[in-house]
Amino acid sequence: NTGHDVGGFAGPAPEPELFVRWVQNGVFHPRFTIHSWNTHLDGTPDGTCNEPWMFPDVLPMVRAAIQLRYTLMPYLYQLLRRAATEHEPLLRPLWLDHEHDPKAWEAAAAEEDAGSFLLGEALLVASVVERGQRMRLAYLPDNGERGWWSWHDGGEWHRGGQTVRLDAPLDRCPLLARGGSLVVLAEPAQSAATAHSRVRTLHAFPFPPSHGSATVALTWVED
């Protein structure tokens, strides 16, 4: 049950830009919630409350991030299942699946890689945590010839074992998928309670052509 009280549970309300970035980070956590309980010194409510619609100018960006979370629900469910049965963490430091890559260990302490983490084995999240940041450097762990595909920008492929420059406009968080991965997505929904559609879309992120032929297996469980 890992996750933030997005916007902060106490103290002053966040500014619009960093609120968007906080939401974009939070949607990848098992526990995602936007709320707060701010009080005066005497314990009475101070009238502030963090809500998705608190800043109308950035509401479309907040909505897009939340919709991405709902499309990822099948993937998140599989990760939670593996956490319960195989004791594998959902949120992983870059070195956890790349223990033989010394740069992955170094990246964990590098300021430029603050906010980078793996979501399961397939996805790499490169969160933006600075005001005004529209590009960020991110280290992509060395995974042989598999490399990493950008979730955005038409699926640009990057070789692992290097630091790359990723575009980070305010309307999205840099997200990459490991080459050779299969990710099952759902249709967008308003909430988990209304997500009745059983339609699933399989997104395949292939090995690069230089890898030659390959076979990828996927075990999927929906209770």
Residue map of PLM features:
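Catalytic-domain carbohydrate-binding cleft regions of carbohydrate-active enzymes
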Residues: N1-R172, R178
